[in-house]
Amino acid sequence: MLFDLFKALVLGIVEGVTEFLPVSSTGHILLAERIFDLDQDNFWKTFAVLIQLGAILAILAIYFQRLWRVATHMFTDPAARRFVIGVLVAFLPAVILGLIFGTFIKEVLFNPWVVCFSLIAGGAVLLWVDQQDVNPRHHDAMAFPLPMYLGIGIAQCAAMVPGVSRSGASIVAAMLFGADKRAAAEFSFFLAIPTMLGAFVYDVYKSRGDMTMDHAFIIIVGFVVSFITAIVVVKTFLDFVTKNGFTFFAWWRVIVGTLGLIALALGA
């Protein structure tokens, strides 16, 4: 029991730290499960899905006032309505491709080798984009043009490959379309809400047979840890990238991916 609580604590921290950073939470969770030898355990796979809700609620808590204003004014305020439409437009590509290829991706691509190669490749792309000398044109994540929302949504589909990073793909796309670094990061948070909620509901429905009340306390621990960690990380992350960009996270990806490949090659 104590070791299970320790695993729940570690996985909750990993989820909360990595979910909204451009480093791939799925990739890090898969590697953590490999370290604890949990990658074939159905309960822990379900646990990894459930604790995502803690991270989602962290975003809702941080941006509650802005999101509440959008929700209460979307029928009277054109700007609020355009933002809601933009998020839905960005969300749809992942829904369509997820329904078509979701099972194939989980059965074929969810393995540590793919994760490690994706971490390295994504790190190289993030490093390249971060070092481009561009003059950003868009500074408000709630006021991007509709075609830009669609482009970000299409780019986010790359994150169906574990290790790519949902937030990383959307941040890279937003910056290439002319968003400043803070706005790119913030929109990745907003887009995460429907994307992660949709994936959460779908995965919970499919995994409902693997959950029992015997696991309730372990799940609560992971959920709370994920929520608290995500709040701290998101608030710190925005200030950090505004001042320093994404180079640190690009090298984080490359180093973790490289160490993972070495460990796998040695039979870990």
UniProtKB/Swiss-Prot annotation:
Its EC number is 3.6.1.27. It is found in: Cell inner membrane. Its main location: membrane. One of its GO terms (biological process) is response to antibiotic. It is a multi-pass membrane protein. Keywords: Antibiotic resistance, Cell inner membrane, Cell membrane, Cell shape, Cell wall biogenesis/degradation, Hydrolase, Membrane, Peptidoglycan synthesis, Transmembrane, Transmembrane helix. Disulfide bonds: none annotated. It catalyses: di-trans,octa-cis-undecaprenyl diphosphate + H2O = di-trans,octa-cis-undecaprenyl phosphate + phosphate + H(+). It comes from Afipia carboxidovorans (strain ATCC 49405 / DSM 1227 / KCTC 32145 / OM5) (Oligotropha carboxidovorans). It is an enzyme of class 3 (hydrolase). InterPro entries: UppP. Bacitracin is thought to be involved in the inhibition of peptidoglycan synthesis by sequestering undecaprenyl diphosphate, thereby reducing the pool of lipid carrier available. This is Undecaprenyl-diphosphatase. GO terms for cellular component: plasma membrane.
